[in-house]
Amino acid sequence: EARFRVGGDAIPLAQGQQIVVSTRLPGDAVRLDEAPVVFAGYGITAPERDWDDFKDVDVRGKVIVVLVNDADFEQPELDTFNGRAMTYYGRWTYKYEEAARRGAAGVIIVHETAPASYGWATVTNSWSGPQFDIVRENAAAERVKMESWIQRDVAVELFRKAGLDFEALKAQARRRDFRPVALPGASFSGS
């Protein structure tokens, strides 16, 4: 059970169809209730590349929505991340790790087939069952509660209901001066 809420409108999300929710924390389940939602571009902090999608924005306890891959995929001439070839910063593992370092409650990666290099079926087949991780001394400090993916059309609708333009923000996210954007009145609940 998962949903976005924007103002008084709920956007229900069916597991495996619009969203895939998972966790690598110990235990049977996790739950988020009305967590604020922030668009964090590509969710990358790479000081050696003079890139920081988070700037000084506090995302502790929030769900961040991020784009898959890195900024060069759609605009290889930027050459910030070595062109179209995906760097570690573009991988889902990095995005979850960086969000955990920043105290985010969850991460929602917007799935798009070309920049991910695989279709939605791969996401659902890979993330719909139990997830396993090594035993960690302090798993809660190293993992976000919720790791998830959503279909692009769900992201577009969410942003629209929040009064934002997904494509315009996606273009802004390819710039070094991008700053995270809170989705006005938007929250996420799910388990």
What are the roles of these predicted feature ranges?
Residues 31-32, 101, 140-144:
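A short, structural micro-pattern
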Residues 32, 53, 93, 149-152:
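A generic "functional-site adjacency" signal
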Residues 176-178:
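Non-catalytic propeptide/linker segments at domain boundaries
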Residues 1-78, 180-191:
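Noncatalytic luminal/extracellular "stalk/propeptide" segments of secretory-pathway proteins
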